[in-house]
UniProtKB/Swiss-Prot annotation:
Residues 62-218 form the N-acetyltransferase domain. One of its GO terms (biological process) is negative regulation of cell adhesion. One of its GO terms (cellular component) is Golgi apparatus. It is a multi-pass membrane protein. GO terms for molecular function: N-acetyltransferase activity. This is Probable N-acetyltransferase camello. It is found in: Golgi apparatus membrane. Signal peptide: none annotated. Its EC number is 2.3.1.-.
Length: 219
């Protein structure tokens, strides 16, 4: 196993950090699509739509075309959700990481390195709703460096930071499609606190849910 070191973010890390963040966000799209394809409701809509078009036109070509169009619309809708999230973060806290995370005693951003190459990232900020709880953000590990406990070390770094700063808990959110992330958080010791349905247009067909986790810090 490679020697992994965790250190605080520097401005010279920006391009690599941004790349890891965007790639980590985009890679959830296939899982979201597959999750949608497993839902009976989705197939019901497809069958009804194609059957209706065939009954009106008696055309197999138009029916198949409508099937492809519906699949394309569904994929594009999911793409817009993930792309929109990444773009929003790049306009907000990820636009200037130094200013967003490194200028306060209670916020921080870390990178994981192997042989001086940045291969993982994570950030932490206090929750706006509860200033005694720290929120873990943007955890991502390069694909070719997984299965080396890098995510675990980054999570533990945030927990240690929270403990040193006197926070009562570390909180985070993930999605039901992120199986590897869920296993990681639960292995570290995070407990599920809430499951919510995000209010985006296609969610009634995708069964996409946001899962909130909490790690209580013992005093």
């Amino acid at each position: 196993m490679a020697n992994v070191s965790i250190r605080k973010y520097k401005n010279s890390d920006y391009e690599t950090v941004n790349f890891l963040f965007v790639e980590g966000t985009k890679e959830h799209l296939p899982a979201a699509c597959w999750n949608t394809l497993k839902k009976p409701r989705f197939y019901f809509i497809i069958i009804v739509a194609c059957a209706s078009i065939f009954m009106c036109t008696s055309s197999y070509v138009l029916s198949l075309t409508s099937l492809v169009a519906l699949l394309a619309v569904g994929w594009y809708g999911l793409y817009l959700e993930f792309h929109g999230y990444a773009s929003r973060c790049q306009r907000e806290d990820m636009l200037d990481i130094e200013n967003s995370y490194m200028m306060s005693d209670n916020t921080c951003f870390w990178v994981a390195e192997i042989d001086r190459k940045v291969v993982g990232i994570v950030g932490a900020k206090p929750l706006k709703e509860a200033d005694d709880e720290l929120f873990l953000l943007h955890l991502s590990v390069a694909r070719d460096c997984r299965q080396q406990r890098i995510g675990t070390k980054l999570c533990q770094t945030v927990i240690d930071f929270a403990r040193q700063r006197g926070f009562k808990a570390v909180c985070l959110e993930t999605a039901n499609i992120q199986d590897a992330a869920i296993k990681l958080y639960e292995a570290v010791g995070f407990k599920k606190s809430l499951v919510a349905i995000p209010p985006f247009l296609l969610n009634q067909y995708t069964s996409f849910t946001v899962i909130y986790y909490r790690y209580d810090i013992k005093s």
